[in-house]
Amino acid sequence: NGEKVTAQAVNGFVPIERKWRKGDKVELNLPMEVRYSKAIDKVEADRNRICITRGPIVFCAEEVDNAHDVATYFVSDSNMGATTMGAFSSGVMSGIPYIKQGCSALTGDEAATSTLTLVPYYAWNNRGDYAAMNVWFARDKATAIAGRDKVAKLPVKTKNFANKVATAKAGQQRKYHDGQ
Protein backbone atom coordinates (compact mmCIF):
# COMPACT_ATOMS: atom_id res chain seq x y z
CA ASN A 1 0.00 0.00 0.00
CA GLY A 2 2.88 2.33 -0.74
CA GLU A 3 4.75 1.61 2.49
CA LYS A 4 8.21 0.07 2.31
CA VAL A 5 8.63 -2.98 4.49
CA THR A 6 11.87 -4.84 5.06
CA ALA A 7 11.36 -8.54 5.59
CA GLN A 8 13.61 -11.53 6.16
CA ALA A 9 13.19 -14.92 4.52
CA VAL A 10 12.38 -17.79 6.87
CA ASN A 11 12.90 -21.26 5.39
CA GLY A 12 12.58 -19.83 1.88
CA PHE A 13 9.45 -17.78 2.59
CA VAL A 14 8.97 -14.11 3.44
CA PRO A 15 6.09 -13.78 5.90
CA ILE A 16 4.19 -10.50 5.94
CA GLU A 17 2.24 -10.15 9.13
CA ARG A 18 -0.40 -7.46 9.27
CA LYS A 19 -4.14 -6.97 9.44
CA TRP A 20 -5.24 -7.32 5.82
CA ARG A 21 -7.99 -5.14 4.34
CA LYS A 22 -9.84 -5.31 1.07
CA GLY A 23 -7.78 -3.59 -1.65
CA ASP A 24 -4.41 -4.10 0.06
CA LYS A 25 -1.55 -4.54 -2.38
CA VAL A 26 1.82 -6.20 -2.05
CA GLU A 27 4.46 -5.07 -4.50
CA LEU A 28 7.69 -7.07 -4.62
CA ASN A 29 11.07 -5.76 -5.65
CA LEU A 30 13.13 -8.81 -6.54
CA PRO A 31 16.52 -7.69 -7.83
CA MET A 32 17.82 -10.04 -10.48
CA GLU A 33 21.52 -9.64 -11.09
CA VAL A 34 23.20 -11.00 -14.19
CA ARG A 35 24.75 -14.39 -13.47
CA TYR A 36 27.20 -16.55 -15.39
CA SER A 37 26.58 -20.30 -15.25
CA LYS A 38 29.37 -22.68 -16.20
CA ALA A 39 28.41 -25.67 -18.33
CA ILE A 40 29.03 -29.08 -16.80
CA ASP A 41 32.08 -30.85 -18.20
CA LYS A 42 30.02 -33.94 -19.15
CA VAL A 43 28.57 -31.92 -22.05
CA GLU A 44 31.60 -31.97 -24.34
CA ALA A 45 30.29 -29.33 -26.76
CA ASP A 46 29.89 -26.82 -23.91
CA ARG A 47 33.14 -27.38 -22.01
CA ASN A 48 34.73 -24.11 -20.93
CA ARG A 49 31.57 -22.22 -21.85
CA ILE A 50 29.08 -20.16 -19.89
CA CYS A 51 25.49 -19.09 -20.33
CA ILE A 52 24.19 -15.76 -19.11
CA THR A 53 21.07 -15.60 -16.95
CA ARG A 54 19.11 -13.03 -15.00
CA GLY A 55 16.86 -14.53 -12.37
CA PRO A 56 15.25 -17.60 -13.93
CA ILE A 57 15.65 -16.27 -17.48
CA VAL A 58 18.32 -17.59 -19.85
CA PHE A 59 19.59 -15.05 -22.38
CA CYS A 60 20.92 -15.65 -25.89
CA ALA A 61 22.61 -13.68 -28.64
CA GLU A 62 20.92 -13.32 -32.02
CA GLU A 63 22.75 -12.49 -35.21
CA VAL A 64 20.36 -9.59 -35.90
CA ASP A 65 21.57 -7.65 -32.82
CA ASN A 66 25.31 -8.29 -33.05
CA ALA A 67 28.12 -7.17 -35.35
CA HIS A 68 29.93 -10.53 -35.45
CA ASP A 69 28.91 -14.15 -35.96
CA VAL A 70 27.38 -15.10 -32.59
CA ALA A 71 29.60 -18.21 -32.38
CA THR A 72 32.74 -16.02 -32.31
CA TYR A 73 32.06 -14.10 -29.09
CA PHE A 74 33.75 -15.05 -25.84
CA VAL A 75 33.28 -13.74 -22.31
CA SER A 76 36.45 -13.99 -20.23
CA ASP A 77 36.54 -13.74 -16.45
CA SER A 78 37.65 -10.11 -16.75
CA ASN A 79 34.47 -9.30 -18.75
CA MET A 80 32.07 -10.84 -16.23
CA GLY A 81 30.07 -8.08 -14.60
CA ALA A 82 30.64 -5.65 -17.49
CA THR A 83 26.93 -5.39 -18.23
CA THR A 84 24.20 -2.85 -18.78
CA MET A 85 20.50 -3.64 -18.99
CA GLY A 86 17.64 -2.09 -20.85
CA ALA A 87 14.47 -2.89 -22.78
CA PHE A 88 13.52 -2.58 -26.43
CA SER A 89 11.30 0.47 -26.98
CA SER A 90 9.56 -0.35 -30.26
CA GLY A 91 8.50 -3.08 -32.64
CA VAL A 92 7.67 -6.67 -31.85
CA MET A 93 10.34 -6.68 -29.10
CA SER A 94 8.91 -3.59 -27.33
CA GLY A 95 9.23 -4.03 -23.57
CA ILE A 96 11.47 -7.11 -23.87
CA PRO A 97 14.60 -6.77 -21.72
CA TYR A 98 18.11 -7.02 -23.13
CA ILE A 99 21.60 -7.23 -21.69
CA LYS A 100 24.69 -5.55 -23.17
CA GLN A 101 27.69 -7.66 -22.18
CA GLY A 102 31.33 -6.61 -22.54
CA CYS A 103 33.27 -9.33 -24.34
CA SER A 104 35.68 -10.14 -27.15
CA ALA A 105 34.93 -11.42 -30.65
CA LEU A 106 37.09 -13.28 -33.11
CA THR A 107 38.06 -11.49 -36.28
CA GLY A 108 39.97 -14.20 -38.11
CA ASP A 109 42.18 -15.70 -35.41
CA GLU A 110 42.57 -12.41 -33.53
CA ALA A 111 40.37 -11.13 -30.71
CA ALA A 112 38.78 -7.69 -30.73
CA THR A 113 37.04 -5.92 -27.85
CA SER A 114 33.31 -5.99 -28.45
CA THR A 115 29.86 -5.83 -26.90
CA LEU A 116 27.34 -8.63 -27.05
CA THR A 117 23.60 -7.91 -27.08
CA LEU A 118 21.55 -10.66 -25.43
CA VAL A 119 17.79 -11.20 -25.40
CA PRO A 120 15.70 -13.63 -23.35
CA TYR A 121 15.76 -17.11 -24.88
CA TYR A 122 11.95 -17.09 -24.96
CA ALA A 123 12.01 -14.06 -27.30
CA TRP A 124 14.53 -15.19 -29.91
CA ASN A 125 13.59 -15.49 -33.59
CA ASN A 126 10.58 -13.19 -33.23
CA ARG A 127 11.72 -10.73 -35.85
CA GLY A 128 11.38 -13.02 -38.86
CA ASP A 129 15.12 -13.19 -39.34
CA TYR A 130 15.80 -16.95 -39.13
CA ALA A 131 19.32 -16.00 -38.11
CA ALA A 132 21.94 -17.66 -35.96
CA MET A 133 21.54 -17.74 -32.18
CA ASN A 134 23.90 -18.74 -29.37
CA VAL A 135 23.38 -19.51 -25.67
CA TRP A 136 26.74 -21.01 -24.62
CA PHE A 137 29.69 -18.61 -24.92
CA ALA A 138 33.36 -19.54 -24.85
CA ARG A 139 35.35 -18.27 -21.88
CA ASP A 140 38.56 -17.74 -23.83
CA LYS A 141 39.97 -17.26 -27.32
CA ALA A 142 41.14 -20.87 -27.81
CA THR A 143 37.69 -22.27 -26.98
CA ALA A 144 36.05 -19.73 -29.30
CA ILE A 145 38.37 -20.71 -32.18
CA ALA A 146 37.75 -24.44 -31.62
CA GLY A 147 33.96 -23.91 -31.50
CA ARG A 148 33.90 -21.64 -34.54
CA ASP A 149 35.64 -24.26 -36.66
CA LYS A 150 33.14 -27.05 -35.94
CA VAL A 151 30.47 -27.85 -38.49
CA ALA A 152 26.85 -28.24 -37.34
CA LYS A 153 24.25 -30.23 -39.26
CA LEU A 154 20.69 -29.36 -38.35
CA PRO A 155 17.46 -30.69 -39.85
CA VAL A 156 15.46 -27.96 -41.52
CA LYS A 157 11.68 -28.22 -41.90
CA THR A 158 10.19 -25.33 -43.82
CA LYS A 159 7.87 -25.19 -46.79
CA ASN A 160 10.83 -24.40 -49.06
CA PHE A 161 13.37 -26.78 -47.58
CA ALA A 162 11.32 -29.80 -46.42
CA ASN A 163 13.55 -32.68 -45.30
CA LYS A 164 16.75 -30.80 -46.12
CA VAL A 165 19.83 -30.53 -43.93
CA ALA A 166 21.42 -27.19 -43.17
CA THR A 167 25.18 -27.35 -42.99
CA ALA A 168 26.61 -24.31 -41.28
CA LYS A 169 30.20 -23.38 -40.63
CA ALA A 170 30.99 -20.18 -38.79
CA GLY A 171 31.77 -17.34 -41.13
CA GLN A 172 30.19 -19.06 -44.14
CA GLN A 173 26.74 -18.99 -45.67
CA ARG A 174 24.39 -21.88 -44.83
CA LYS A 175 24.09 -24.61 -47.46
CA TYR A 176 20.99 -26.77 -47.82
CA HIS A 177 21.20 -30.30 -49.16
CA ASP A 178 19.65 -33.77 -48.85
CA GLY A 179 22.12 -34.85 -46.15
CA GLN A 180 24.44 -36.58 -48.64
What are these regions (language model features)?
Residues E3-V5, A9, R18-R21, K25-G179:
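C-terminal beta-rich recognition modules with glycine/proline-rich loops and embedded aromatic residues
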